Amino acid sequence: MLKKGFGNFIMNNDKEFLATEPIGKLLLRLAIPTLAAQMINMLYNIIDRIYIGHIPGSGALALTGVGVCMPLIMIISAFAALVGNGGAPRASILMGKKDLDSAENILGNCFTMQIIISVILTLIMFFGNRTFLMAFGASENTIEYAVSYMNIYSLGTIFVQLTLGMNAFITAQGFAKTGMYSVLIGAVINIILDPIFIFACHMGVRGAALATIISQACSCIWVLSFLFGTRSTLRIKKQNLTLKAPVILPCLALGLSLFIMQASESIISVCFNSSLLKYGGDVAVGAMTILTSVMQFAMLPLQGLGQGAQPIMSYNYGAKNTDRVKGTFFLLLKASLTYSIILWGLVMLFPQVFAGIFTSNQALVIFTKKALRVYMAVMFMFGIQISCQMAFNSLGKAISSIVVAVMRKFVLLIPLIYIMPHIFTTDQTMAVYMAEPVADFIAVTFTAILFSVQFKKALAAIRLS
């Protein structure tokens, strides 16, 4: 009884703002630090590529080699999302129900699961990366750059897993600024170490990888010190570390949609790279590395907004406050659409600026300028897709999230990558890039229709309960 009462005391004093504070003010309070963290994380993820692309003499090939590593890196991040972004919304919902014990049980189980996954991934990525990289589109010119990067990066898998996965539980509790600092610490250290290791120590791509895992280790220490400490409402405790199927399996089910979204990016990257290598050679694959980086720039702030809204929607859904759930979603939708439309305009007007950030090779800049306009032609619609996807997760709607993720990636995009070059035969390389906007347009339309039906059902269900 003492434990339960103490938990409620914390909840009432620290988390009641999720149920009472004006939605607009609250979304800003949570989303701005989360959004800042996502922007910092974007820099964190692409800073290696910016420096690598400017290595004298070998920058273009080195950039392409590191770009081929992206499928493996995305798989590592996807497993963090599977556990962290599956468990965190469920913990938030339980916090809304004032069940702190069950929420902490989820946190402990997710921590253990991420350690197990990290060990397995490290072994696979270290000993098998050359085979994967060749399959993912590396050529004889770029394979050694790719292997050099992954040999070092794979050793830091556990830091990536725990930083990304456990940070989701910090944000889900409403500690948005603390979550931002988790990313900021790593980003600052990475930005400082990159030029030292790459240029001053003449380590090239190996230096970029080493800087990344050191900075991730520092972020990991920050995240775990918070979740093991007394400032966190939910804490990692020894009695919750034993895996229990009824606890961890629903978390994995909810996180599966985000896992599919991120892991499928690696499959899609393989499809893009192999098709582009066939029709356009190394320059087309190098351009894809830049397009992927710009896409991260587009998506991460949207995900930051969604993650800022997630604790509000999840908490109030658990508390059966339908008006706040609905109000939060529509505010998220407006903000996300506004951002995606503005960024779409900038990319369409100034594609050479975005391309020039990543490479000083003029031939690659010119090629990427055209590819960017094709690849991101319907980016203005991304706000709808991300808002609906994050809302599905916030409400614990695992099946709907999975359907949306599978629809866009596997049903639409992958087949289109191979179909489009046979339809637009005059420029088959650009036809490969065109698969992205065609798939996006159809997927967003499908998601909006499905969400409008499911959202009404979810709200009606808690009104009747």
Give residue spans per PLM region.
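Transmembrane helix-bundle signature of multi-pass secondary active exporters and lipid flippases
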Residues: 35-89, 153-160, 249-316, 336-344, ...
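Transmembrane alpha-helix boundary and packing residues in multipass membrane permease domains
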Residues: 34, 38, 50, 89, ...
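Short runs within selected transmembrane alpha-helices of multi-pass transporters and secretion channels
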Residues: 84, 153-171, 182-187, 208-221, ...
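Helix-loop interface residues and adjacent transmembrane-helix termini in multi-pass membrane transporters
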Residues: 43-46, 54, 60, 94-97, ...
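Juxtamembrane/transmembrane-helix interface segments of polytopic membrane transporters
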Residues: 41, 45, 49, 53, ...
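Small-residue-rich hydrophobic transmembrane alpha-helices
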Residues: 63-123, 160-179, 287-351, 382-404
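Short alpha-helical transmembrane segments in multi-pass integral membrane proteins
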Residues: 1-31, 91-156, 200-255, 313-378, ...
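Short loop-to-helix capping motifs
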Residues: 139, 175-176, 204, 281, ...
